[in-house]
């Protein structure tokens, strides 16, 4: 019986228990696609990686005047292996230019309310259960230490974000699990603190 679950697996468990059974009990895995298509999942990974790299370079304090140019340069290097694909050049890159402009504008204003940002940060907690301890893990897109000492847990979505109803009914629990781990001090380099905000950025 599995005793370790990631935050994303909890959502899978709720939505489709058999998929988790197939993965964790039957050990079934989809075959690797040797010629991966340019799809929405790849686009999401590239955007996440670009934003994470930028935040790791600028975790605290005011942003440099050329912040937008730096973010786009970082993203351009990540997009480069797929640049010959017309969809990448003519659709995804223009979309990222729009995303990056919004991100930097938002970030400039946000820096007045935060002490530091942690991007792509790993965390885990152990919870006692009747059959023995269960470990919950997560890799948060971003956690900010707020000026007042609390935390804000953020998740980037390049596709559709969960609805408020789905989160309220605990049908989408990724941010909730990450917030519990954060509140208990389970993320690397972050002391326990009150989680004051959970946000989806799309």
Task: Name each region found by the language model.
Residues 28-36, 57-63, 187-190:
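Short, polar/flexible loop-turn hinges at active-site or ligand-entry regions and domain interfaces
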Residues 66, 116-117, 179-202:
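Substrate-binding beta-hairpin/strand module that engages nucleic acids
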Residues 118-186:
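Non-catalytic protein-protein interaction segments used by genome-maintenance enzymes to assemble
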